[in-house]
């Protein structure tokens, strides 16, 4: 068995054993997971973890990476988010939390254009290099704090928050087009929900929460007040 065969077998196992069993069944999503090579976005020192059911640290030790939100999300979480918002070929997408660039690459394989924001300079460089090597040309990686989105480039058809938040800031919702979708992981450890918000009118939105998970925080998003008595 060649190294390439082993790699493809591991990818197959990830899709069949982790992702399909988590109700990710859209054939377009499953095809993207075959096409976009996850291992090309994983740090060299963690290549053995590319298809493992876990978060992968992008910088430093695992605990520190979790605290700073500098990770690749679990593969099944990435796939579920992608299925929830699946962009159309004419759509413009905003991602907050570029990380290694993998989610942006998945989104870009469907969308017309993706802008992804990353606050950590080292990860900005990593994402840009990974996307360039993968020949993904319709993604722009910007070094920026994404907690308030990117109103100057809006409105967007799709917004993806690649990490967890206590709540979705109104400023981000206002940057959705009518008919646009926002995906986020919302809540507090140990109870977080995969959340899909659709803008249905100028001031109306629908929210569905379809699945449970836990993910590291995105930096600088508001946290709920904690009163002590």
Task: Show which residues each predicted segment covers.
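Class I SAM-dependent transferase core
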Residues: 1-94, 110, 123-133, 201-218, ...
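Conserved nucleotide-cofactor-binding alpha/beta core module
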Residues: 82-205
């Amino acid at each position: 068995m060649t190294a390439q065969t082993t790699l493809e077998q591991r990818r197959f196992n990830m899709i069949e054993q982790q992702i399909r069993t988590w109700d990710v069944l859209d054939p377009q999503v499953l095809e993207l997971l075959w096409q976009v090579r996850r291992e090309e976005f994983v740090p060299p020192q963690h290549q053995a973890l590319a298809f493992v059911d876990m978060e992968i640290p992008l910088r430093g030790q695992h605990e520190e990476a979790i605290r700073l939100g500098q990770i690749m999300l679990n593969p099944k979480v990435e796939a579920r988010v992608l299925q929830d918002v699946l962009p159309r070929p004419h759509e413009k997408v905003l991602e907050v939390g570029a990380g290694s660039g993998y989610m942006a690459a998945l989104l870009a394989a469907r969308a017309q254009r993706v802008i992804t924001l990353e606050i950590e300079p080292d990860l900005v460089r990593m994402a840009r290099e990974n996307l360039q090597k993968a020949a993904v040309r319709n993604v722009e990686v910007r070094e920026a704090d994404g907690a308030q989105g990117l109103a100057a480039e809006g409105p967007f058809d799709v917004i993806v928050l690649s990490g967890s938040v206590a709540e979705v800031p109104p400023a981000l919702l206002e940057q959705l087009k009518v008919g646009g979708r926002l995906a986020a992981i919302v809540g507090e450890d140990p109870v977080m929900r995969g959340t899909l918000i659709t803008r249905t009118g100028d001031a109306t939105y629908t929210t569905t929460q379809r699945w449970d998970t836990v993910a590291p925080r995105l930096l600088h998003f508001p946290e709920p007040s904690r009163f002590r008595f």
